[in-house]
Regions:
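Short, Lys/Arg-rich flexible segments
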Residues: 1-162
């Protein structure tokens, strides 16, 4: 059980590192827009079961690799990239604006008139965690830590530890 718990902790760290390496997102943004939870490790008929759960909301597009980062006026083109493997793409009919409460975001008009406008968002942290590259790396890391800790726990018990 302690080996499984240590593996889940390592999995959480690996998720954050891997998400950061695949997407243009900072650790502060990951922690602000998501919640990471553990299902407690349980003994069932089919063995030990444990899981890591991610919950969170979509992240404003301005938090990714976007130019310009400040509010602009006129016909300044907005370019954005969400994944590190992709280059910035120009977003047609988008603009950067600062709202009265101070929030800066990437917006687009819903119609030809000035209002209403809607903010553009990137993927949420749970959606990023579903990426195949991220999942594979995290799974490998969790298995590696569990196997190492299992050996350590067995050695401890066999050598008379409590």
């Amino acid at each position: 059980k302690p080996a499984m718990q240590r593996g889940l902790t390592a999995g959480r760290t690996a998720f954050n590192k891997q998400i950061k390496s695949v997407y243009y997102v900072s650790p502060a943004v990951i922690s602000r827009y998501s919640h990471i939870g553990y299902k407690k490790v349980e003994m069932r008929s089919d063995g030990l079961i444990g899981s890591i759960e991610y919950a969170g909301t979509v992240i404003p597009l301005i938090k990714y690799n976007v130019t310009p980062q400040k509010a602009t006026y006129g016909k300044t083109p907005v370019k954005a990239a969400v994944k590190r493997s992709e280059s910035q793409v120009e977003l047609a009919k988008s603009f950067t604006a600062q709202m009265p409460n101070g929030h800066i975001g990437i917006y687009e008009r819903k119609s030809d008139s000035s209002y209403p406008i809607k903010q553009l968002y990137g993927p949420s942290v749970p959606r990023m965690a579903e990426n195949a590259v991220v999942l594979k790396t995290v799974e490998d890391r969790v298995n590696e830590v569990i196997n190492n800790r299992m050996e350590h726990e067995l050695d401890r018990i066999l050598n008379g530890g409590s």
